[in-house]
Amino acid sequence: MNNEKNVSFEFIGSTNEVDEIKVMACYAAGSICGEKRGYCSSDPGRYCPWQVVCYESRKICAKNAAKMRMNVTKNTI
């Protein structure tokens, strides 16, 4: 265990359980992305871990995660 900070964040999920699991995995990847703290989301309509994008602030992350959620359809697995 190195000197890693625990990053807490509000979970932005969707009404689809499968989506929530995938988005949560994306956030987990974001917390270890790069050498600085990262907040994670993915490109609109894409899921992590294939498309991981890290942001420097929670505000940017929340904005992009909300955008992603709007673009993801429930029949995507």
Curated annotation (Swiss-Prot):
Gene3D superfamilies: Amb V Allergen
GO cellular component: extracellular region
Location in or out of the cell: Secreted
Disulfide bonds: 26-61, 33-48, 40-54
Keywords for the protein's UniProt record, in alphabetical order: Allergen, Disulfide bond, Secreted, Signal
This protein's record includes keyword Repressor: no
Source species, domain of life: Eukaryota
Signal peptide residues on this chain, from the entry's feature table: 1-22
Matches recorded under Pfam families: Ragweed_pollen
Keyword Disulfide bond found: yes
Name of protein: Pollen allergen Amb p 5b
Organism: Ambrosia psilostachya (Western ragweed)
